[in-house]
Curated annotation (Swiss-Prot):
The chain crosses the membrane at residues 64-84, 100-120, 260-279, 292-309, 717-736, 748-768, 789-811, 833-852, 865-883, 899-919. This is Calcium-transporting ATPase. One of its GO terms (biological process) is intracellular sodium ion homeostasis. Ca(2+) 2 binds at residues 300-301, 305, 756, 760.
Length: 926
């Protein structure tokens, strides 16, 4: 019955369908068993039980305890724990304080806490999605309008919306009055969308073009409407994005994977070497206790205890440097990951472009003008055929500019030297170009006050205003009438309503040939990626306007405007090409516009195809994999398209950075190896899903961040070379002691920890601030799958470790024999302190040599004064361990004579001399 309240049972509700935009309003009511008077409270309660609350559901993640427990799954930490237990048991058995065991346990716990702090940062992207929901909504139930919590909405509810409301669920419009909705967070399109209830759209229309539907999380800017809810909670478009977000699994970064493999190699190698040493010791008749001490020391020596902390500091330093270059790193490992990027997928608007519409071409019947200038700054030149002209000398131009300034609802605002607009960017550009010609838009609007208007709508595709001509300006043609009607909008539609045109400073009849010439000029602008507007006018005897008045118009001309590329982006794209990085444009904009901007920036070339979202949807995985190898520009894409593009690139071994600013971008940002959100225009959801935020929304900043990432990775390789080369030297030195029959372990676990944390750690921190190689962005990206030992690093560590240990073993034998001669005041066990000191001092020379492939004398000290300071400080700390009594007792060292110290210094210099000689030979050879 007409006007009846729906009271259908729960079983009467039909299954949800996918294409609500393709149904009529009546068909939607039938599908949902709903009515304009709303559901009854009973039916709503039944449906709430069936569909659940209108909320986003979060999957359970790892608990903090689970994250902490996972840190102890590291094989190197497990080995250190075993060493601590055995060492502590031996000390307690002998009645000694277990200082070695306690020191090792402290290191293990600190490393675990450090890992926990890096991993425990909860994902907040879903929380940000939830924050987009309004708490209350106006709904019609039991034929009565009422407010209910958003969570209580169900399919079939009739919601009532007006300006300022957030859309609480996905819904099909049933009534609308001048309804405009901001969907940029969901679709990426900046302009408000005109919504109409009485449309029936094709089934394959993308979300951004579903003008008869509303989507959860979007905002009503203007007008009012009534809509029928068809999806709630996780069934909405926002819920689909939440599902995609939670389906993307976080993977370890390349550095984390390399360090895991490094741990496996080091532990395996150490265990094999320990087995060999113990086996040989047994054959030589040595005691198990001595061999156990050797094994414990070797296990501690091979583990680079200070490496996690040094890497964290290096990444933090990189983060600070990136902030200075306008990029904020949200996840520390992303700093190094940037250095592996092989492909950058960038949005167009605001990232590659200025997000400011600029009029660049103007066509009148008699002239074609080119306009220069940047953004909304009212400064630039007008040119004809490349020659600068005076705008005021061309009446056709001035009348056209005046029409654009008057038929306009925007405002041009100056704040110091910064210019911006309030209102629609398209209209703002018309004010700017008028101001470039010397027209004061505000002043012109005062002398031509608006009397009436018909606003722009997506159906009319034009805007009309009637102004009173007070006779105080020459920028109109009164023709004896007190008012003038100005019209702007779709060139084709306005041209159809014109009978005359303004040419040769006078009115002329609009012939078929002239119409064709105007349309051809508009098509040329459109093919260059420009948004084209047509302008016309008609003197009027009355101040009112309706659609019947928009006839018998006089054509003024065309203006072509574009969101101009950022001037620095062309160079950034070129730098990417030199660095072996591919740049792709992925945008929701029109294919012609996207292609024109991409060609201008050097991203693509003439003849290269553009792939649209519709074409992409029709492709299977294999077809898409083939397409992404050659396509650089993607237009009219939806969120799932971005995700598919990223996944396809990753399947082919690409390491992908993806930019985004909307809610719709969040799944792709999370899936990408590096998700890059926009700091100015980005939503909270996109920022929480990202690894990095661009503070200036600028593509060039991504390239600068990639450069910093490469520098950080290069420095990490330097101090890994330094630390592990030294550790291998320590390991081989310790292993040789029982084989040489020296009767004692040359280094205690505590002394080894000192070397690994302090002697290695302080210079390694200084290596982390090494400046980058100027040619670093002229090389191809390093393979993210490469081993930590790749490009000669593994052979370097082995070579240096062997040479280092050879020098130290010779010193150890000499020192052992030399110190057995009794001398007053000197302990015969000081040979162990001499080995300890030689190893520490030799590592200082190693740190100086490892910073560059150039000879040290060719590398200026001023480029990294921190390294020299760290060497001096570490050497002084080592001497304190040797000569300060409390430290002697704690670390088990003995005072050295001047001769002892001179011998240590002499042997420690041998490694530095060897490394410099190796570099000299390499330079001579190549």
């Amino acid at each position: 019955m007409k006007g009846a309240i729906v009271s259908a049972s729960l079983t009467d509700v039909r299954q949800p369908i996918a294409h609500w935009h393709s149904l009529t309003v009546e068909e939607c009511h039938q599908q949902l068993d709903a009515h304009r008077n709303g559901l009854t409270a009973e039916v709503a309660a039944d449906r709430l039980a069936l569909y659940g609350p209108n909320e986003l559901v979060e999957q359970a993640g790892r608990s903090p305890l689970q994250i902490l427990w996972d840190q102890f799954a590291n094989i190197m930490l497990l080995m250190l724990l075993a060493v601590a237990v055995v060492s502590g048991a031996l000390d307690l058995r002998d009645g000694q304080f277990p200082k070695d065991a306690i020191a090792i346990l402290v290191i293990v716990v600190l490393n675990a806490v450090l890992g926990y702090l890096q991993e425990s940062r909860a994902e907040k992207a879903l929380a940000a999605l939830k924050g987009m929901a309004a708490p209350l909504v106006r709904v019609r139930r039991d034929n009565r309008d009422q407010e209910i919590p958003v969570a209580g909405l169900v399919p079939g509810d009739l919601i009532l919306l007006e300006a300022g409301d957030q859309v609480p669920a996905d819904a099909r419009l049933v009534e609308s009055a001048n309804l405009q909705v901001k969907e940029s967070a969901l679709t990426g399109e900046a302009e408000a969308v005109q919504k109409l209830a009485d449309q029936q759209l094709p089934t394959d229309v993308v979300i951004g073009d579903r003008t008869n539907c509303l989507f959860q999380g979007t905002e009503v800017l203007q007008g009012r409407g009534q809509a029928l809810v068809y999806a709630t909670g996780m069934n909405t478009e926002l819920g689909r994005i939440a599902t995609l977000l939670q389906s993307v699994e976080s993977e370890k970064t390349p550095l984390q994977q390399r360090l895991d493999k490094l741990g496996n190699v080091l532990v395996s190698g150490a265990l094999i070497l320990v087995a060999i040493v113990v086996g040989l010791g047994v054959l030589n008749g040595q005691s198990w206790e001595d061999l156990l001490s050797v094994g414990l020391s070797m296990a501690v020596a091979i583990v680079p205890e200070g490496l996690p902390a040094v890497i964290t500091v290096a990444l933090a330093i990189g983060t600070q440097r990136m902030v200075q270059r306008e990029s904020l790193i949200r996840r520390l490992p992303a700093v190094e990951t940037l250095g592996s990027v092989t492909t950058i997928c960038s949005d167009k608007t605001g990232t590659l472009t200025q997000n400011k519409m600029v009029v660049q071409q103007i066509h009148t019947l008699d002239h074609d003008f080119t306009v220069t200038g940047e953004g909304y700054v009212p400064a630039g030149h007008f040119l004809i055929g490349g020659e600068i002209i005076v705008p005021n000398d061309y009446r056709d131009l001035m009348l056209l500019l005046a029409a654009g300034a008057v038929c306009n609802d925007a405002a041009l605002v100056a704040s110091g030297e910064h210019w911006s607009i309030v209102g629609d960017p398209t209209e703002g550009s018309l004010l700017t170009v008028a101001a470039k010609a010397g027209i004061d838009p505000e002043g012109l609007q005062r002398v031509l006050p608006r009397q009436d208007e018909i606003p722009f709508t997506s159906e009319r595709k034009r805007m009309s205003v009637v102004v009173a001509d007070l006779g105080e300006t020459t920028l109109t043609i009164r023709e004896g009438q007190p008012y003038v009607l100005f019209v702007k909008g779709s060139a084709e539609l306005i041209l159809e309503r014109c009978q005359h045109c303004f040419g040769n400073a006078q009115l002329e009849s609009l012939t078929a040939a002239t119409r064709q010439q105007i349309l051809a000029a508009g098509e040329a602008m459109a093919s260059a990626g420009m948004r084209v507007l047509g302008f016309a006018y008609r003197p009027s005897a009355i101040a009112d306007v309706d659609e019947d008045a928009e006839t018998d118009l006089t054509w003024l001309g065309l203006m072509g405007q574009i969101d101009a590329p950022r001037p620095e982006v062309r160079e950034a794209v070129q730098r990417c090409r030199q660095a072996g990085i591919r740049t792709l444009m992925i945008t929701g904009d029109h294919p012609l516009t996207a292609q024109a901007i991409a060609r201008d920036l050097g991203i693509t070339e003439v003849g290269h195809p553009v792939l649209t979202g519709q074409q992409l949807s029709a492709m299977n995985g294999a077809e898409l994999d083939a397409a992404v190898r050659s396509v650089e520009v993607y237009a009219r894409v939806a969120p799932e398209h971005k995700l598919r593009i990223v996944e396809s690139l990753q399947r082919q071994g690409e390491f992908v950075a993806m930019t985004g600013d909307g809610v719709n971008d969040a799944p792709a940002l999370k899936q990408a190896n590096i998700g890059v959100a926009m700091g100015i225009t980005g939503t909270d959801v996109s920022k929480e899903a990202s690894d990095m935020v661009l503070l200036d929304d600028n593509f060039a900043t991504i390239v600068a961040a990639v450069e910093e990432g490469r520098i950080v990775y290069g420095n990490i390789r330097k101090f890994i070379k330094y630390i592990l080369g030294s550790n291998i030297g320590e390991l081989l030195t310790i292993a040789s002691a029982p084989l040489l029959g020296l009767g004692a372990v040359p280094l205690t676990p505590l002394q080894i920890l000192w070397m690994n944390l302090v002697t290695d750690g302080i210079p390694a921190l200084a290596l982390a601030v090494e400046p980058g190689d100027p040619t670093i962005m002229q090389r191809r990206p390093h393979n993210p799958q490469e081993s930590i030992f790749a490009r000669g690093l593994g052979t370097y560590m082995l070579r240096v470790g062997v040479v280092f240990s050879a020098f130290t073993i010779v010193l150890m034998v000499i020192a052992y024999q030399y110190t057995q001669v009794p001398l007053p005041g000197l302990d015969p066990k000081r040979w162990q302190t001499m080995v300890f000191t030689t190893l520490c001092l030799a590592q200082m020379g190693h740190a100086i040599a490892v910073r560059s492939d150039l000879l040290t004398i060719q590398t200026p000290m001023r480029t990294n004064p921190w390294l020299w300071l760290s060497v001096i400080v570490t050497a002084l700390l080592q001497l304190a361990l040797v000569y300060v009594s409390p430290l002697q007792k704690f670390f088990g060292t003995h005072s050295l004579s001047q001769l002892d110290l001179a011998i240590c210094l002499g042997f420690s210099l041998l490694l530095f001399v060897y490394l410099e000689a190796e570099k000299w030979v390499r330079q001579r050879r190549y």
